[in-house]
Amino acid sequence: MTQTFADQKRKTVETAEFTEDGRYKRKVRSFVLRTGRLSEFQRNMMNDNWGTLGLDYQTEPFDFAKIYGNDNPVVLEIGFGMGKSLVDMAFANPDKNYLGIEVHTPGVGACIAYAVEKGVTNLRVICHDATEILRDSIADGTLGGLQLFFPDPWHKAKHHKRRIVQPHFVTQVIQKLSENGFIHMATDWENYAEQMLEVLSANTDLVNTSKNGNYIPRPDFRPLTKFEARGHKLGHGVWDLYFVKK
């Protein structure tokens, strides 16, 4: 069976890197490539709409004004899952541009399908490693905000190094934010919430908007996600953090 464009995307979510002597350089990933298959519908959505809703990884910064056709602030969301809440936010905020990153191709296909259904035009999606996109494809000072909702908690202590929220990640994000740009995170794992708070609070370029110096109630503009609903059913709390760049 001939592989389509959508089938190929899963194989190119990150670029290979090698040591000086030519050996493959292993990376500490914050994600796992799941083996879920694209449905025929999701595949068709990706193949038919990538030209208008998709972006490919590149080694030079994106020209957001050209991509979106305006100078509205760009909000980046990393790990949007199936994309429903991301599309809903884009639909509700036409004065903002949204850029979503997800390595799971069925999620990318589902997000595109829902965006087409809603008629959303201020959204683009990428199927690639977010750390490489931040490093290579986004210029400093060009993001209005970052959203990171319910990232993989890597709950075992030996796997905490795989959590995406680390000091070097936050430093990288801050470089990409414009003045007064925001970082909004949410998790239903208390231990991860504590780590997020510690890492974000330690960076002197950020200000916590919480009146108590820790977490905020879920704001109305963040849709209730299936992960949050799942957490409620399991008796988990949910913690939102909202910091602003000085």
UniProtKB/Swiss-Prot annotation:
This protein's UniProt keywords: Methyltransferase, S-adenosyl-L-methionine, Transferase, tRNA processing
Keyword S-adenosyl-L-methionine: yes
Presence of the UniProt keyword Methyltransferase in the record: yes
Catalytic residues (UniProt): 152
Reaction(s) catalysed by this chain's protein: guanosine(46) in tRNA + S-adenosyl-L-methionine = N(7)-methylguanosine(46) in tRNA + S-adenosyl-L-homocysteine
Top-level taxon of origin: Bacteria
One Gene Ontology cellular component annotation held by this UniProt entry: tRNA methyltransferase complex
Enzyme superclass (EC): transferase
Pathway named in the protein's UniProt entry: tRNA modification; N(7)-methylguanine-tRNA biosynthesis
InterPro entries: SAM-dependent_MTases_sf (IPR029063), tRNA_(Gua-N-7)_MeTrfase_Trmb (IPR003358), tRNA_methyltr_TrmB_bact (IPR055361)
EC number: 2.1.1.33
One Pfam family recorded for the sequence: Methyltransf_4
Binding site for substrate: 156, 188, 225-228
Listed PROSITE patterns: SAM_MT_TRMB
UniProt-annotated binding residues for S-adenosyl-L-methionine: 77, 102, 129, 152
Gene Ontology MF annotations: tRNA (guanine(46)-N7)-methyltransferase activity
PANTHER family: 3-DEOXY-D-MANNO-OCTULOSONIC-ACID TRANSFERASE/TRNA GUANINE-N 7 - -METHYLTRANSFERASE, PENTACOTRIPEPTIDE-REPEAT REGION OF PRORP DOMAIN-CONTAINING PROTEIN
Reported function: Catalyzes the formation of N(7)-methylguanine at position 46 (m7G46) in tRNA.
Family stated for the protein in its record: Belongs to the class I-like SAM-binding methyltransferase superfamily. TrmB family.
Name this polypeptide is given: tRNA (guanine-N(7)-)-methyltransferase
